[in-house]
Amino acid sequence: MDRTAASRPDLYLIADQDTVYEQDLFRAPGSIKPWLAYIEYKQQNGTLYEQAFVMERACKQLPRSYKLWKMYLEFRINHLRGRNATKYRAEYQKVNALFERALILLNKMPKIWEMYLSFLLQQPLVTQTRRTFDRALRALPITQHNRIWKLYKAFARSASGQTAVKIWARYMQIHPENAEDYIELLVELGQYTEAVKRYMEILDDPRFQSKKGKSNFQLWTEMVDLLVSKAKQIRTGPQVGIDVDAILRSGIDRFADQRGKLWAGLATYWITKGNFEKARDVFEEGITTVMTVRDFTLIFDAYVEFEESIIGSLMEAAAVRADKGNVDEDADFDLDLRMLRFEQLMDRRPFLVNDVLLRQNPNNVIEWEKRVALWGDNKEEIVNTYTAAIAAINPKKAHGKFSELWVNYAKFYESGGDLDTARVIFDKAVKVPFKSVAELADTWCEWAEMELRSENFDKAVDIMAKATQAPKKSTVDYFDETLSPQQRVHKSWKLWSFYVDLVESVATLEETRKVYERIFELRIATPQTVVNYANLLEEHKYFEDSFKVYERGLDLFSYPVAFELWNLYLTKAVDRKIGIERLRDLFEQALDGCPPKFAKPLYLMYGNLEEERGLARHAMRIYERATRAVSDEDRFEMFEFYITKSASNFGLTSTRPIYERAIAALPDQEAKEMCLKFADMERRLGEIDRARAIYGHASQFCDPRTNAGFWQKWEAFEVQHGNEDTFKEMLRIKRSVQAQYNTDVNFIASQAIARSQQRAQEGAREREGEEAGTDASKERADAMAALERQARAPIGFVAASTGPEGGNRPPPPGQQQQPQPSAPVNPDAIDLDDDMDAE
């Protein structure tokens, strides 16, 4: 099927059956339809030669027909598919020639170019293929170039080498957004210098956006990793435009959280380049400039590993020399020097870590103290550290107590016996504008304590007197942060407390009283101050002055603080046995405005005074007042105490009005307890009817299901002192009270709770005996079931638990009536027969 054979009229390829198609071609020589029909017929019935003959004629007849050319070219390509391009080189060249003929008039058809280029990619024709790609790009409009570049990039990867680099360089002019793929190719091809340049270009381009979603930091990190790992293969210098040191240092300034990694990377770069001294300089710069311990640790560990590797290699070389018997003093000296340098590096580590923390916050007092401790006995460095700390720390921003640093600085000189220098330091310290008044007060106190340790007592007193200097009437607010600590320190309680203790221990009473008086003038006294001052005067037999101090303290403080002062004051006054009228006035003052919760102890003390030194009736009136004045929590106990005192002084009958008022004043639960005590008292007096009436009154507070103990006591009382009628009356009241509680919604929940508690208590008794447990379980009903039965019952009535028993007489012993199976058991049942009989 060569070109010459196809161009001449090969009449033998035209069969008799083709006449119809040939006549159609003759009648319509410019139409494509007859040719398509002819080709289709040959595809079904003709040989490959006949098909090629017809297609060749069609393309020559209609050279601008894209459809015919595409059909013909696909036919020829399919014929060669799977055949070796080298072995059948001539056939491949024929098809290449056909593509060239087609492109003469169809050079704007991208599909033809794609077919041609794909066909060329199967052949080992690199130069021809590259030139054909270039022709395609020139022939097609730029909107169609993406179709060509897709194949061109694949060709570039297969061609590799400089061909691939140059192809991609051209591609980047059109599609700079694919720079990452280009960089990957350059790295694969070992073109590291060019790859770094491309990294720098995209990082400098603010419009570049990664197609793979990488941030600028990720791209920059990839570039740095490439620079460090391929340091020897990458050309650097001004002529190339790559300055690795400047690149990494710019990243150190820009990416604060990656400084440790970048410093280590820069050092690794110089190590890879073989410049060990430069690497050591980088390590030193890194560990002395980073701001976090994490970065420091990363750099320091890399530094140590670097030094260990060098020392290890030098030791191996020394071992080899020793084996050979060679002596190299310079090499041995270098090894010793590096060993010494390594030891020094390890010794510096705590100081370097401390430097990092102080760079983070130079106002960190705690770290400055640690630095002082690191120097141990090196006095010169300790002084330098204290001096540097005082110069660096801003008192208003200090983290920790700045005053402690000053104090420790002074103590350092004190421990060395240089008190004069220590005093100079303290004198400067008390002028520092600390964050708080407390720090300044601590400094003054420490100064005085230093003088005390040196037994300069007068000097210590003078220092505290100077610290507490203030105007006669100071209007300064201790908590006013707008004022300096020096302006407010004279109102520091800590300072005055130390001052008064000091004066009390080393000075006279008069001087001590002056200090206490000054504290009261400044109105900074605390309750403890009042007590201490009063005790001091009492020890020196100034009892009246001591009482006046308590009174001044009571003017300063209100309840609840005043309660403790009154307690002490009244106790002291009573013990001194001052006039009864004066004591009464004091107690009345104490009780005036006293909160109820603090009233009970004062009333008891007041009543006891009247009992011992006054009149019993006065004491009773005080106790009666107390029952009204104390809090609700103390009222019951106060009534009990009042009743006990009244009974002991005036007999049991005198307690009746007290009981009556207590029952009226106390809440129901406590009133019930008081009723029981009242009834027991009447019973002991033989007043049975009065006791029964009290039980009847108390019954209104006691639900039989939740207060069974009350009803048991009443029942025992009736058994001992009553008769059948009084016992029936008790039972009637019990049923009526139970009915009252059944119709009161407020008690339904409490009944349920009480039943559950009752079940828990009776659970232990059930285990004692099976028979007794069975009876108890029948009597106990579920609380919710009882409520449901009550809801279904008519209002005011409770369904009977059993059928009629033939009167109110109980069955004979041993013949207990069994409940009817059809009647539900109801523990709330009320038997009305007794009421009817009573009528």
From Swiss-Prot:
Locations listed in the record: Nucleus
Keywords attached to this entry: mRNA processing, mRNA splicing, Nucleus, Repeat, Spliceosome
Signal peptide limits: none
Species in which this protein is naturally found: Aspergillus fumigatus (strain ATCC MYA-4609 / CBS 101355 / FGSC A1100 / Af293) (Neosartorya fumigata)
HAT repeats: 12-44, 46-78, 90-122, 124-158, 274-309, 377-415, 417-453, 470-502, 507-539, 541-575, 578-612, 650-684, 686-720
Segments of this protein annotated with the region Disordered: 758-839
Function: Involved in pre-mRNA splicing and cell cycle progression.
InterPro entries per the UniProt record, alphabetical: HAT, HAT_Syf1-like_N, HAT_Syf1_central, HAT_Syf1_CNRKL1_C, Syf1-like, TPR-like_helical_dom_sf
GO biological process, one term: generation of catalytic spliceosome for first transesterification step
Family: Belongs to the crooked-neck family.
Entry protein name: Pre-mRNA-splicing factor syf1
Cellular component terms per the entry's GO annotation: post-mRNA release spliceosomal complex; Prp19 complex; U2-type catalytic step 2 spliceosome
Stored SMART domains: HAT
Compositionally biased residues, Basic and acidic residues: 762-782
Gene3D superfamilies: Tetratricopeptide repeat domain
Keyword Nucleus: yes
Main location class: nucleus
Listed PANTHER family: PRE-MRNA SPLICING FACTOR, PRE-MRNA-SPLICING FACTOR SYF1
Disulfide bonds: none
